[in-house]
Amino acid sequence: MSRVAKAPVVVPAGVDVKINGQVITIKGKNGELTRTLNDAVEVKHADNTLTFGPRDGYADGWAQAGTARALLNSMVIGVTEGFTKKLQLVGVGYRAAVKGNVINLSLGFSHPVDHQLPAGITAECPTQTEIVLKGVDKQVIGQVAADLRAYRRPEPYKGKGVRYADEVVRTKEAKKK
């Protein structure tokens, strides 16, 4: 039985929740998010809280209810506060610049890398070696950050590459003669 699913999600003032079958729409000051939940999950909205439980006849009902609760909690946080993800570029000549909804990266390749941002995601570069991603959808921000990191992952000898701001890169010792 899922302990996560037993905790209700508190819906703050100014957030509108619409339940249409298994399709949940949450609208707040930062935007609107929609998600289709698994058929094994039953969602109830009462007194500014969302409660979750399994439907009869589904073996994985509690597990799916816990997943649905975590997803909807992230949606509520996203439309009220939003999410940010910070990336750092470590290496000589590694630079980033934002032009509109395109991030231009110089990562030591013979060509610049241009990454198109999806709708709803904004980026800014406080310095040439930092990227800050902002948006309402936690999953999309994480995917964009992972895509940017995949262009040049931190290598284990000097730690050069694109890394998350809170990431600790374990370095190896160089070969000795």
From Swiss-Prot:
Q: Name one GO biological process term.
A: cytoplasmic translation
PTM annotation (N6-acetyllysine): residues: K44
- Xref: SUPFAM superfamilies: Ribosomal protein L6 (SSF56053)
UniProt cross-references to Gene3D superfamilies, sorted A to Z: Ribosomal protein L6, alpha-beta domain
UniProtKB keywords: Acetylation, Ribonucleoprotein, Ribosomal protein, RNA-binding, rRNA-binding
Question: Is Acyltransferase among this UniProt entry's keywords?
Answer: no
One GO MF term on file is: rRNA binding
Q: Which GO terms describe its cellular component?
A: cytosolic large ribosomal subunit
What the entry lists under Pfam families is as follows:
Ribosomal_L6
The superkingdom listed in its UniProt entry is: Bacteria
What family does the entry list?
Belongs to the universal ribosomal protein uL6 family.
Looking up HAMAP family in the UniProt record yields: Ribosomal_uL6_B (MF_01365_B)
Can you state the subunit structure given in the record? Part of the 50S ribosomal subunit.
Q: What does this protein do?
A: This protein binds to the 23S rRNA, and is important in its secondary structure. It is located near the subunit interface in the base of the L7/L12 stalk, and near the tRNA binding site of the peptidyltransferase center.
Q: What is this protein called?
A: Large ribosomal subunit protein uL6
- Record organism: Shigella sonnei (strain Ss046)
Q: Name the lineage.
A: Bacteria, Pseudomonadati, Pseudomonadota, Gammaproteobacteria, Enterobacterales
Could you tell me the gene encoding this protein? rplF
